[in-house]
Amino acid sequence: MPGLCIGILLLIGFGCTTAYKIPTPTVELLETGFSVSIPDEEGVKVVAFNVNRNRNFTSFINEGQYNVRLTEPQNGRWTTNFSSVPLRSQDVLYLWTSVQHQKAVYQDLAQPLPVCNLGGEYRPRGCSPGDDDFTDDNQLSTEDSALEPTAPSVCEPSESQVSPQIGVSICKGQLLFEETFDQLNESLWIHDVRLPLDSKDAEFVLYDGKAKVHDGNLVIEPLLWSSYRPDLSIANSRLDLSERCTGTHNRIKECILHSTGSGPSGIMPPIVTPRISTKETFAFQYGRIEIRAKLPKGDWIVPLLLLEPLTEWYGQSGYESGQLRVALARGNSVLRMPRGKLVDGRSLYGGPVLSTDAHQREDLWLSKRKISHFGDDFHTYSLDWSSNRLLFSVDGQVYGEMLNGFTELDENPRWKQGGPMAPFDKMFYISLGVSVGGFGDFVDHLRTATYEKPWANYHPQAKLQFHQAQDQWLPTWKQPALKIDYVRVFATDN
């Protein structure tokens, strides 16, 4: 949309013209961060830059992760430095610019800006293979990141790629990432602080709080709102998380919570739970991920052992860029579909997520059934992800395989612009947590051993319906925590 004239009228009777066109912004890498600038021209009053890292913009409404409003040029340019922003070779910047020229406001959306294509003196490691003259403070050390870039003595090249790049060839079967949770390395794992945004899918939780480590296991345990903020009413209060919020799609909706009880905003999230990811520190394209975990038990709890897209290349709504579930088993000890099929914690699932709809989602999942709840013991869950298939296993036993061809589903025409495995042909990062309730993992009219699912999907008061049934589901939360022994990622054998 270069030179798009929005023509916001600041005086009655002023019309939008195309006499002014926003110049192409200059984006240059700094030693840490980057600068953005445009040349000054007569009549320019205000300039605003909005930048996202690895998230495209869908409109001019949302501010960027990094944003600034300038009222004065410097040395003939409107310029700003976004310092202390760690950039990696695989990152892509998205930029929209707003300029008040005379009495009209113009807005322009730039093309995606791969970091390695930017100007400036500096380059993240990985932009210039084999060039050791560049240094990058964002390149993770083996000690801090659990990356182990040691290749076998005889190396058969793998199709796996990692970000940040590790500076050596990646060999088949090579260990790329390992976390054993002897302690919680907060330089590696970033805590989410945000409200789920998608109203068609959103679980009934607020992501906040710190995950813990106990006896060599990561522990992620959901809490009731009353335990999280006893000073704030669940039905009539306001909470602004902006200073800590990690939301990037719509910070107003993801970072500022308010409730009016029976009003349109409903109640506060009934559940608050930690969630961590390697979004800022480690991502990979193709490989085998292994997670040894003990899944939670309790009605309407779902473990999140996920791979999520680093760059939402194919879109950012309705899972247009995909999500991969390494494994999940619902926390319910007994849960039946309307026609009697059991879908409780004795059923293990793994597969891609490409839709917010619970029925469509499960149609793509692979499953395995056993006589006891998967949360009774630790199990090793594995996903082998390559350029032509997804292979799911538990404790070394394969229970399902899915070949490429997702473009044939006609869910997103942009997938046809990618490779055969699109949308799963880009970098993905690791995300760990639990969700509770929501619309994506539980169809309507499910029944436990003693009561029917207490909320209706997409009902405006679904959270309230769930909360009001607390006396039914809370007594089942005997083991609500997700426990993880280790996470490992190996290069694929492809």
Curated annotation (Swiss-Prot):
Coiled-coil portions = none
Alphabetized GO MF terms:
(1->3)-beta-D-glucan binding; lipopolysaccharide binding; pattern recognition receptor activity; peptidoglycan binding
Q: Which SUPFAM superfamilies match?
A: Concanavalin A-like lectins/glucanases
Please give the GO cellular component terms listed in this UniProt entry. Answer: extracellular region; extracellular space; plasma membrane; side of membrane
Residues of this chain annotated as glycosylated in UniProt: 56, 81, 185
Q: Which UniProt keywords apply?
A: Cell membrane, Glycoprotein, GPI-anchor, Immunity, Innate immunity, Lipoprotein, Membrane, Signal
Record-annotated CBM39 domain positions? 20-120
Q: In its keyword annotation, does this UniProt entry include Transmembrane? A: no
PROSITE patterns the record matches: CBM39, GH16_2
Signal sequence coordinates: 1-19
What is one process in the GO biological process aspect for this record?
A: innate immune response-activating signaling pathway
Q: Name the source's superkingdom.
A: Eukaryota
Any idea where the GH16 domain is? Answer: 135-494
Task: Using the UniProt annotation, give all residue ranges assigned to the region (Disordered).
Answer: 126-160
| Bilayer topology annotation | Lipid-anchor; GPI-anchor
Name its cellular compartments.
Cell membrane
What does this chain do?
Plays a key role in innate immunity by acting as a pattern recognition receptor for beta-1,3-glucan from fungi and lipopolysaccharide from Gram-negative bacteria. Upon recognition of invading microorganism-derived products, acts upstream of protease spz processing enzyme SPE to activate the Toll pathway and to induce the expression of antimicrobial peptides drosomycin, cecropin and attacin.
Q: Which family does it belong to?
A: Belongs to the insect beta-1,3-glucan binding protein family.
| PANTHER family per record | GLYCOSYL HYDROLASE-RELATED (PTHR10963), GRAM-NEGATIVE BACTERIA-BINDING PROTEIN 1-RELATED (PTHR10963:SF60)
**UniProt name for this protein:** Gram-negative bacteria-binding protein 1
Taxonomy-wise, where does this protein's organism fall, top ranks first?
Eukaryota, Metazoa, Ecdysozoa, Arthropoda, Hexapoda
